[in-house]
Every structure is written in structure tokens, then in C-alpha cells.
Amino acid sequence: MKILIGLAILFFNAAGAPQPSALQQQNTALTAIAGPDRVVVLPSKTFLNGYVGYGDPPRRERRRNEPTPPPPPNPGPAPIAGWSKESGPGPVVFADAKALSTTAAFTAPGAYVLKLTADNGQARAFSTLSVIVDTPPPATHLNAVYTKNYRINSPLWSHRAESLIVNWIPHCIDQINRGDLEQGPGGIDNFVEAGKKLAGQPHGNHKGYVFSNAWVHQTVEAMSIALMIDPQGDQEIIKAQAKMKATLDDWIPKILAAQEPDGYLQTAFTLPRIDGKGVVTPGPFNHWERRGDHEGYVAGYFLESALNHYLMTDKKDARLYNAAKKLADCWVSHIGPAPKKEWFDGHQEMEQALVRFGRFVNDMEGGGRGDAYIKLAKFLLDCRKNGGEYDQSHLPAVQQYEAVGHAVRAVYSYSGMADVAVETHDPEYHSAVRSLWDNIVNKKYYVTGGVGSGETSEGFGPNYSLRQNAYCESCSSCGLIFLQYKMNMAYGEAKYADLYEETLFNALLGSTDLEGKNFYYQNPLDSGTPRYPWHGCPCCVGNIPRTLLMLPTWMYAKTVDSLYVNLFVGSTATIEGVGGTDVQMVQVTDYPWDGNVSLTVNPVRQSRFSVRIRVPNRSVSGLYASTPEADGIASITVNGEALKPMIEKGYAVISRAWNAGDKIDFILPLKVQRVRSIDAIAATQSRVALRFGPLVYNIEQVDQDITQTLEPDSPLTAEWNGSLLGGVMVIQGVFAGGGKMTAIPNYVRNNRGPVPDPATLTPPPGGGRPAPRPPTSIVWIREK
């Protein structure tokens, strides 16, 4: 917030007549900007980076197609700046209250307001920022449940998983095997040619983007996870899984042959490169020299793919796992404090992957074997500075409090920061990642759980700028799920799982069509474009299925004496190492169509531990309010006996000695809800969204005129339609004009239109874009 108080400054022409244009008056006003609101986790301090000057400060990044800003205005007298505490329950100590860049320290938790004052002797300007000071984080954190062999028995998820396994992943395999793609080239052929070069044989050039290896690694991971799903006799799934096994047998030797002797692996650095004009650059290409070469992006996906491949083989095939350690060791050998190289990558997948991989190596091997990878993650994040907002290098990581720049890079970076905060117990990392989470969820978050409004190159826009025709890239939804999940691991609070459920069921689940043959790169809430089979930048194609199919990881978390239930999906999975035993968990539920959930707890032997069940909260984000209320758990029984469990951090806690066959039954309230946004979001004023449980709904032109208006209190009902879109709960109502209204879940939107011709594929980001089509499916309905 900024407040301007002072004198207008006028410009004069040669004759002495004043020429106070509106732009000049705006650009010459004395201005103070304190900076973003933030969270401080004790005993951390907060970093203040204020601005005092005339007019708005220069931005590091301009929005897409924004004209070059005018030159800076002639300043008035040099202003004097000063920081002060305006309100709060305890003292605030500024390192230097007269410096724009300084720190503030707190001793007491609570809500504070800090003020920055600018004074030039003629005028004064003020700006404030809010600080929430919180107590230190818990000393321990939740532990991951690795996705291993599991079974899905959910009507919704069984169909979605089958479409990914039978159609989408095999389609990705076929595309990656092709050497003639014009859109999104650069598949397994790059590894083949790199292997030839390393073997001293004649070879071709690198195809596609420098980061094209990424979707190969993603697809390897997606195949590995898909092979851990019990086909339950489904012949189509069995056939598709056989294709995946054969593909892995074919691809893995080719990938390993492309790894350089020191462990480095990225074929764009091994092979000559050819640009769009056919010009060949033979190399050599120096490692860790150009931040835009996506070295960490590619490497991080390889580490994650190796992790899940190793699990899929029950730790019997260590080829990719050992190669991933060799690659990570290569980075550790070259990147780090002097005499090693100081470095950060332009796309932060390595930062997201390293702690996950390091923990995994420690779990597999012990002895701190993975600790060096965790330390490298922190070093890479610590090196981020002196750059721009686009790749989150505009400030040191611990001084970042507002989500800015490219949304995928941002959520990957923040995901890594959450891991580092937990591993290092660094209060400055805790403060930064809590602040970034708060900024996203309460200022830059779509009702579908998507992020990235697209004003700044596929990125975050200003606070509350949530236009409905952009952007919500599928990869940003994947990254946001990882971020929310890691926040849940760090703080043990159910609200983070509430949010990744929202993103999973809405922004990401509908990124592929119902058949699993086409996908969306973007997921705007107002849309009129059909999905497409491939993309000029197919960065999402493997990311979508690897994230959606990792269900046991999203469903459960654990400590030595607690088992956390975060998602409700009909399924069978085994959680290892709770209460000194392994526990098979069997969920029986038709959620989200029905709120009845039955959990059967099957420990290998009797054991005492706590089962902690997430108590849903549909309104975690402060941007939206839903009515009527549909939070909580309506009733809960254990072996038929009713109980009222304690609620801790959003979880219903049931502590007892568990025996195989013990059953927990509970009911989750599911109601049709109207969702309205706060006034600060201009794009959604006089509009209402609908939801049922975790699902946000759309109305579509194929069913009605979507420009019609709803009365604010008109009756709405949920009705099951088994013949529509594979079987969905629809919301029925009547528009103000008397016409029937039918709303369908957001994830099944745009599944009743024509399938696009591959020749009409969307061009890659950064290129020319086709004119947007009028929306045929919308989330926010006009409200009378």
C-alpha cells in the first residue's frame, strides 16, 4: 500500500507556461513503497527493501507486449527515508531505520504493521506492510510415503488412471520415439546420437530445445509409476504396461550410453546443435555457463525418474539409480563454495529434486550418503541473486516474499526452499517460504487451484490480477502440488493438503481429455479451445501423468508413530514403518461423488499409533468464500463405535492399538456451494462459481447460453448423471430468465467438441499465438 501526500510538480515550456500532463504528474509524485506483506518465523529477522523516489520504481520485468516505459522524470529534492513500527504486540528493532535496505527483528508473535516514510522537505509519502510473526516451526517433520505397488478402486480415479495408462503414456512413448516431429522434436533419438558420439562413432545433431531430454525423463518416471498400479485383470492396461516394460528395456541402455564419463548427462551439451535456420554449432559447450540452457531442469527430472524406476523394480534394477547418483555427484564435484563454481540454473527443477533425491538415497543406503545432495540444493538457492524476477533471481532466496516471474520456475524454486527450510532449520528460509506461500494462496490463486495469470511470460502477475482467460500452465499445477505437499511435510498442517487436493482435482485432473489422447498446456477458467495431441514445447506431457499417478504419496504421510490420511480415494496401499510395523490401508469410497469413506487399517502385527484424518476445509484461501459451509467431518466411528476425536492442525486424531481389520467409517459433508471472491479481484465481481466437495464446476455453451445470469439465492441441486462424460455429478439450477442451468465438473470441461487436427497445434511459448476463441466453457457465472 502506498499513500502520496504532497505538492504537484509542474513542468514549464520555453515560454514559461506550465505543462502538467497527467503522466508527468503521476511520474513525479513523491512515492514510498515498503514492499510486500510477509511472515516472519521466529527467531528470524525480516529483510526490508523499500523504495523512495519520484514515480513508480523501475520494474525488472515488463508484462508481455507492454511498451517501453518513459524515461525517469526529473526528481525533486532528494527525499529522506525512515522505517518505524506502526502497530504490533512487541518491540521491533531495525538494524538501520534510515536505510531503505535493512532488517527488522521481532521477539513476540503477532500481527505487526511497519511503515516507510519519505520526506523531501516539501512533501511526505507513506507506505506500510503487514508482518505476521509466528512461533518457531516444529522440530520434526512428516516423512514421505513412497509410491509403490498399489490398487485403485475409485470410480473417478480408476477411469482417469486407465486413460493415462492405456492412451496417454503410450502416445508419449510413440511421439518420443519419432525422429520426424516438426512440433516438439527431440526425443530418444538425441540419446542415441549422443551415445554414438561418446563411443567415437558417426552421429547426428541435437534436435529440439536444449531441454528436450526433460520430457523423456518425465515419461520414464510416468511409465515407472504406471507399472506400479495393479491392472486387476484389465487387458487394455496389461497390454499398455507390457509396452511400457518393453520401452524401458529399449530406452534405458540408450539413456545410459549418453551419460558422459564424469556423470554429466544432457545431450544438448554432447551433440552439435542445429537452430531453426539449419545452422549447426558444433560445440564444445561449456557446462554451467548459460543459465538459459536448463541444465538443472533436465538433471532434476532425471534424478526423480531414477527414484521411481528404482522403486518400481523393488530395488532390483539400480541402473538409473546409480546413474542418477553419478550425475548428482558430478554436480557436487563442480558446484559449491570456492574453489568450486558458484551457480544457479534458470529453471529450478534441480532445486526441487535434490532434497527429495537426497532423502531417498539416505533412506535406501543410510550413512548420510545423500547429505551432499541436500547441501547442494541449499547452495543453488543461496546463489540466486543479481538477476531478474523471471527466474526468481532478483533477490536472495531468503529475501523473497512475493511470488513473481515464470510460474513453473517459481513454484519449483519455492518447493526446493520448503525442503531446505526443513533440512537446515533455517528460520530465514522458513520465513521466506511461508511468505511466498501466503502471497500465492491469498493474492494470486485461482479458485481451481491453478496459478500463473500470464502477464509476465507464463508467470505471476500483480496481486489480485486473476484474469479468467489465462494462464494456469499444467506444469505450474504439478509444481504447486509438490509445493503444497512439501509444506504439509514441513509443518504437519492439513490446510496444505486441502489445497493440493483442490489443484489435483481441478487444475491438473482436466489437463488431459477423458480418453487420454489430448492435453492442455494452459488451463484458463474461460476456455474455448480444444485440447491438442502434442505441443511445440511438450514440457507438460510426462509431467501430468507422473504427478497424477503418484497417488499414494499424495494420499498418505507418516511419522514413526502417526499415519496421516490426506486424500480420500478408493484404493489399497501399504505404508511402511509406522508404529514399528507396515500398515496396509484400504479405502472404500465413491468420493468426491459421495461423502461416505471407510478405512480398513491392516498392520502386519498389532501396533499402537495414531491415524490422523484430514478434516476438509474448503476455504483455505482468503480470496474466496463458499456458502453454505461444507467443512469438517459429519460423523466418525471405529469398529462401529462413535467417537469425537481431538482435532490437531486440521486432522482428526485417533490413537489406539490397531489390529488387522480395524475399520474407521466417517462422512464428509458434500453440498453444492456458491463461491464468491473478495472485492479486490476485479475479474470476478458480480460473478459466482459453483463447487461440490473439492470439485469446481463449469457451465458450457453446449448445454446453455453461458452469458445468462443466476439469481443469488436460486435453488441448486446435485444430481448424478451416469451417462454423461463417463458419469459425473452435475449441478442443476434455473437462470434468472427461466432457462435451465447445468454445470459439470471443471475437469471434464471441453470434452464434447471436435478433436483438433495436429496441424493446428499451438506454437511454442514465446512465439506468435493464435487469437483466443470466444469461451465455450466458464467457471465464473454472472450473478444478478
Each PLM stretch: what is its role?
Residues I80-A104:
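Surface-exposed, flexible coil segments in extracellular/virion-facing regions
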Residues T28-G35:
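Proline-enriched interdomain boundary motifs that mark the N-terminal boundary
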Residues N49-P58, P70-P75, E86:
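Acidic, Ser/Thr
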Residues P137-A242, A246, G276-M312, Q348-D371, ...:
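Aromatic (Trp/Tyr) and acidic
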Residues V433, D498-N506, S511-N602, L623-V638, ...:
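C-terminal beta-rich recognition modules with glycine/proline-rich loops and embedded aromatic residues
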Residues A125-D134:
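C-terminal edge beta-strand
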Residues L100-P109, I654-R656:
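Solvent-exposed segments in extracellular or luminal domains encompassing
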